[in-house]
Structure formats: structure tokens, C-alpha cells
A protein has these predicted regions:
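Beta-strand cores of modular interaction/reader domains in eukaryotic scaffold and signaling proteins
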Residues: 39-41, 66-68, 90-93, 118-121, ...
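Short glycine-/polar-rich loops that comprise or flank the Walker A/P-loop
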Residues: 86-89, 115-119, 159-162, 251-252, ...
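Polar, glycosylation-prone regions of secreted, cell-surface, and some intracellular proteins
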Residues: 109, 255-256, 275, 285, ...
Length: 353
């Protein structure tokens, strides 16, 4: 298995997303990086489990890759900087704010900044796992780092800075995180010095599956639920068999985007009545929500009128509508909810279909 949280029906394999072949760069990368490892840095007491998992999964996905993790490889704390100097890149786990109060973590980071090592930035926001929001981490960093170092560690969108990769623990989403980490690790290797991108896929992974529909789908979006408009049109753009309907009667499904605020006020009351009527009429509702806007679905449930909860509105799981590298997973989860079969690109049914 790729992770304790992933149980695929076939052994996943990292392949080029362009041609579905094992990336040749990985072979050269592994051979040339053995003496220049990927250095993993994190707050040792709070975020050890995450980096241990990342190391284990990268070794499965990129056979032969050399990865330095102090609990496995450190011989002398006094020589910490020399280990950074011997590395090709550094993976920084942005999790606990205690990272920026640790003398040794700051030593590692300072040496990487001095050497201008490529940084693979991975963010764990899960507070239950000692994670924290990026703005809080940036504030903590700004107290201990120079402005340019804080900028390099947290800025996004600049051409020279790759994205900050969210670390998620749910299987299909974690696959997206791992593939993105592997892409950035490859791009930091000598083998890819002149390569702009190396899009990768996990063979059999949901994010790279091709949804197929037996019949066309028409999605209704209520004017009382404007948050559903953009996801509905994105689904219609991504999935050829899906369209958007202004009429509930003409639609096959209703996409309802729920949040703690969606049933508030007069408009929310009207939406509640509309949902009640649709539920009573046996309409097929597909629910979605944003974990990036609301960190716990229980807040959505608590804010939902009791009558809707009692009527079974949440008997079917709401789709996590995520952005960035995880959007492909959200789109395919929505496609499954709309009746699609997930076909692996190499043929056969995708895991989790």
C-alpha cells in the first residue's frame, strides 16, 4: 500500500501523466542523488509522524531516492549544517509553529537559505496533528527570520517558487499530495535541470481516472445557493457529459453547496424550504462543501436547520471541494456522485470506483 490510509486494489505506480510511462528522469534522479539527498526538516516533537510517512512513501514512489531524516541518519548534531550542505534540496514541513523556536530547525533552514537550496514546502494544517494555518506560521516565522527568508518560505505565485503542497490524510487526497511532492523533488534534481515540469500520476489513483457516464447529467443550481454556481460550471467544463440547468424539473441532479452560512437569513430560509420540497419529491441532491473555508463539517451540520438534518440531508456524504493539486480528486468524487464509473487510463476500473 502507498499509505496506511490508502488501500488500492492494485499496487500504485508513479508514472508520467503525459505518456503514462514510468518517468525516465526518476532513474537518473535516483542514481545522481544518492550522494546528495533530499533533506527533511520539521519540528521534531510535533511533526515526526508526517515526515516519516513522506519519507517512506517517496522511497516507494521513487525507488533508490536518497532521503535524509535525522532520526534515521544523523550521526552528530554538531555536523548538522554539513548534512544540509550535502543535500540537493530541502523538504520543509510547515506544521507546528514551534519549528520557529527550535534552534536546530533554524540552523537547518538558515543553511538551506544560505545555499539557496530548492525548497519543497509541505503544509499540514490539521490542528489535531499539531498543524497550524499558514498565516499563523508566517507570523511565527517573521519573529525569527529575516524578511527575505520568510518571503521565500511562504510566498506563492512567483514564477521561481513552486506551490506550497497541502498535506492531507484522506487516501485519494493524500495521493495528490504525494504526487506533487514527488514532482517537486524530481524538479530539484540534476536530471531535471532543464525541465520546466514533470507532471506525475499514480497509476490506479482516483485523481487521474477518466469518468465515464452512461447518460448525460444536468445539474441544477439554485439562485438561493450562489456558492454552487462556480463548482457546477467547473464540473460542466471538466466533464463532457455534464451540463448546468436553470430548471430543477429539467435537471437530473441538484448540486447543493453547504456551509455554516447557507441557511442564514431570509434567503437561507427560502433555500431551506426549497430543499425540503425537493427532498420530499425525491430529487437527487449532490452535496459539496469547502474544508478550506470551514475546517470541520460538524460546523455545517450544527448550522443546518434541524428539519433538514432529520429529513436525512446528510445521509450521503458531502463532497470535499478542494482547490489546487486536489481539485482533480474533488471533480472525480463529484463525478462518482453523479453516477460516473471511474476508468483507469490503462484500462479497467479505478480503485475506489
Amino acid at each position: 500500500t502507498i499509505s496506511p490510509t490508502i488501500a488500492p486494489t492494485v499496487s500504485p505506480q508513479l508514472v508520467s501523466a503525459r505518456d503514462r510511462l514510468r518517468p525516465q528522469a526518476a532513474v537518473t534522479f535516483s542514481d545522481r542523488l544518492l550522494s546528495a539527498p533530499l533533506f527533511l526538516t520539521r519540528e521534531r516533537r510535533a511533526n515526526q509522524d508526517v515526515v516519516a510517512t513522506i519519507k517512506r512513501q517517496l522511497q516507494l514512489l521513487l525507488p533508490g531516492v536518497s532521503i535524509f531524516l535525522d532520526v534515521d541518519d544523523l550521526e552528530s548534531i554538531d555536523a548538522l549544517e554539513s548534512y544540509v550542505q550535502a543535500s540537493q534540496a530541502m523538504l520543509v514541513l510547515l506544521g507546528s509553529s514551534q519549528y520557529f523556536t527550535s534552534r536546530n530547525c533554524l540552523r537547518e533552514l538558515a543553511e538551506a537559505q544560505r545555499l539557496s537550496l530548492p525548497l519543497v514546502r509541505v503544509h499540514d494544517a490539521d490542528a489535531a496533528k499539531n498543524g497550524a494555518p499558514l498565516p499563523s506560521l508566517r507570523t511565527a516565522a517573521s519573529r525569527r527570520l529575516q524578511r527575505q527568508d520568510t518571503t521565500r518560505l511562504f510566498d506563492v505565485g512567483a514564477a521561481q517558487l513552486p506551490i506550497i503542497i497541502p498535506w492531507l490524510r484522506i487516501g485519494h487526497f493524500q495521493q495528490g499530495s504525494l504526487a506533487s511532492i514527488a514532482e517537486q523533488v524530481l524538479l530539484a534534481s540534476p536530471a531535471c535541470v532543464d525541465v520546466a515540469s514533470v507532471p506525475l500520476a499514480l497509476k490506479g489513483g482516483l485523481a487521474w481516472a477518466e469518468p465515464t457516464f452512461a447518460q448525460p447529467v444536468a445539474l441544477f443550481v439554485s439562485q438561493l445557493n450562489p456558492a454552487a454556481t462556480e463548482p457546477a460550471h467547473e464540473l460542466a467544463s471538466a466533464l463532457a457529459e455534464v451540463g448546468v440547468s436553470a430548471s430543477l424539473d429539467a435537471a437530473t441532479h441538484w448540486l447543493l453547496f453547504v456551509s455554516p452560512e447557507c441557511f442564514e437569513g431570509e434567503q437561507g430560509q427560502q433555500l431551506e424550504a426549497q430543499v425540503q420540497a425537493a427532498t420530499a419529491a425525491g430529487r437527487r441532491l449532490v452535496l459539496a462543501w469547502s474544508p478550506e473555508a470551514c475546517d470541520d463539517f460538524k460546523h455545517v451540520i450544527e448550522a443546518t436547520p434541524h428539519a433538514l438534518v432529520s429529513a436525512g440531508l446528510y445521509e450521503t456524504l458531502a463532497i470535499e471541494w478542494r482547490g489546487g493539486v486536489h481539485r482533480r480528486v474533488s471533480v472525480r468524487l463529484a463525478a462518482k456522485a453523479l453516477g460516473a464509473q471511474m476508468m483507469a487510463s490503462s484500462g479497467g476500473t479505478c480503485e475506489g470506483a
